[in-house]
Amino acid sequence: MEIILFLTMMVMITYVFSGYLYRVALVQSSRVDLIFTRFENMCFKIIGTDLEHMSAKTYVKHFLAFNGFMGFITFVLLIVQQWLFLNPNHNLNQSIDLAFNTAISFLTNSNLQHYNGESDVTYLTQMIVMTYLMFTSSASGYAVCIAMLRRLTGLTNIIGNFYQDIVRFIVRVLLPLSCLISILLMTQGVPQTLHANLMIRTLSGHIQHIAFGPIASLESIKHLGTNGGGFLAGNSATPFENPNIWSNFIEMGSMMLLPMSMLFLFGRMLSRHGKRVHRHALILFVAMFFIFIAILTLTMWSEYRGNPILANLGIYGPNMEGKEVRFGAGLSALFTVITTAFTTGSVNNMHDSLTPIGGLGPMVLMMLNVVFGGEGVGLMNLLIFVLLTVFICSLMVGKTPEYLNMPIGAREMKCIVLVFLIHPILILVFSALAFMIPGASESITNPSFHGISQVMYEMTSAAANNGSGFEGLKDDTTFWNISTGIIMLLSRYIPIILQLMIASSLVNKKSYHQDKYTIAIDKPYFGVSLIVFIVLLSGLTFIPVLLLGPIGEFLTLK
């Protein structure tokens, strides 16, 4: 019942919050202008931008240059961190390959962590590098999505200014909400301090070091920005990051807030005036929510069912291996599905200890990479499947392929197919390399089917810019650092470039007025068709490897 109430509340909150996002996205005046405008203008002066509207090509150039500059600075700071200030625990520099992986991971909103948060980064890099990139990577994804929506919806004839979009989103959305969430988490016991690690003497007489630091400030944007990188190695399973059931709900709600609001925002932009949500967006929301609930149900069923091997020995009950007692199997499964559906990557339980079908659910969500997804890019990925569905359905019934009165031609379809293929190609090719390259497979700690699942999960998490992992994998090696770094880089930027190209190509075409020869995208049957094509196309791509991984493991448990 608590899960149903939580999900219902989040749907209502995101629907209302999308109205505020609408005013932020379209640079409309609001009551908060007196608070934020001066700070925004100061940021624009520091950046040196004159807020001129950019072409799509210029927008992408500035997006890539901004991200490239941040990535370079991050890499440099990580390899010299031991000589900088705010290092009371005397942590050492990261190796070149690990710094490469870490910089790309946080730059691309993935937060795949091959390092130990307690010992491999300093307070300075946690705050200046990790926390800063959590803001900018999230805002970058939002900015390119808004640029795409402006063109697709025809609400304006401009794509916008990259720096204006990113600054407004950080100042008016991320910063206020992060401060609020940080305060809420601190009231639940999450630390926020620059004090060095505590050194205590245990009852047995041994000395123990307890790691903590400025956790609350990182924890808030970690979930709000769908980042996922933890201050501590145990992530949100540790009491310092996620002390109780209330902090657990705060963190889950933070993950869901912006991606769900973006879908409603799309509907408000389609309705032109923003006071209501267009039926097309509601159909998309219901379709994605249906997939989300289906996988949540499957995951919870598997985790409550427990391990059949133990059941045969007379030991019944849910699968509690790798889980925190304060959350139990139900809230652990919910957190797992949310963190993979919304591509956050934070964890409150050990995913490597999930049952085979329990691990299949989050893996499938990352393979689909469209069920709400991350900040901005999740909606962009969904729209690719929408365009693909419109095109196929139109040809199947002999109608004209068009979307929002824009005809879909050969050029757009080539880009759409490329975006669709990049994701599975990166996952499958690099997974195969992990088994072929000498030394790479030595990181696998489980034999047979589960070992394949470990590799597939790691590569899928990197390709989906998620960041969670089956942490039984020994991934801090040169191969895993470089390979997952390349995957995160390619899977983030190539689709974004192609998606903006698709939007620009569509709007440059002559408007096509909808008639009886076009597919109605605001009807329930379109939502059903979308679900079928998402499952069918992704299923044909990944079913063979899933049979070798979690499904094969499930069939062997008796």
Curated annotation (Swiss-Prot):
Membrane-spanning ranges: 1-21, 66-86, 127-147, 166-186, 245-265, 281-301, 327-347, 354-374, 377-397, 416-436, 482-502, 531-551
Show the GO MF annotations.
P-type potassium transmembrane transporter activity; potassium ion binding
**What keywords are assigned to this protein?**
Cell membrane, Ion transport, Membrane, Potassium, Potassium transport, Transmembrane, Transmembrane helix, Transport
Which InterPro entries does the UniProt entry name for this protein? Answer: KdpA
GO terms (BP aspect): potassium ion transmembrane transport
According to its UniProt record, where is this protein located? Cell membrane
Q: How does it sit in the membrane?
A: Multi-pass membrane protein
- According to its UniProt entry, what is the function of this protein? Part of the high-affinity ATP-driven potassium transport (or Kdp) system, which catalyzes the hydrolysis of ATP coupled with the electrogenic transport of potassium into the cytoplasm. This subunit binds the extracellular potassium ions and delivers the ions to the membrane domain of KdpB through an intramembrane tunnel.
Question: Subunit structure of this entry?
Answer: The system is composed of three essential subunits: KdpA, KdpB and KdpC.
- Know the name of this protein? Potassium-transporting ATPase potassium-binding subunit
Q: Supply the source organism for this entry.
A: Staphylococcus aureus (strain NCTC 8325 / PS 47)
What gene codes for this chain?
Answer: kdpA
